[in-house]
Amino acid sequence: MGLKYLAFKNRGQISLELGVLVLAVAMVAVFAGYLYIQSTLESAVKINQTANGTVGMYNSAVNRITESVGNLSNN
């Protein structure tokens, strides 16, 4: 009985360790996915802010040029 019980116990421990290892790998994958999604969302917000700033600067430049042309034609 001793030898069979020992062999079964080792298989059970290996199975438990494998289960813990798989769980750890899954948790790391979930955490990496979370960080990837957070990074993507932050990048999207930053891109939106940059685009809005660029459009605002472009509009200001166009308005200044339009006023300059309007002033030239009024003179």
Swiss-Prot record:
Subcellular location as annotated: Secreted; Cell surface; Fimbrium
Residue ranges of the propeptide: 1-12
Disruption of the gene: reported phenotype: Disruption of the gene does not change the piliation compared with the parent cells.
Motif (QXSXEXXXL): 13-21
Database matches in InterPro entries: Class3_signal_pept_motif
GO cellular component terms given for this protein: cell surface; extracellular region; membrane
Expression induction: Expressed under standard laboratory conditions at 35 degrees Celsius.
Protein name, UniProt field: Probable minor pilin MMP0903
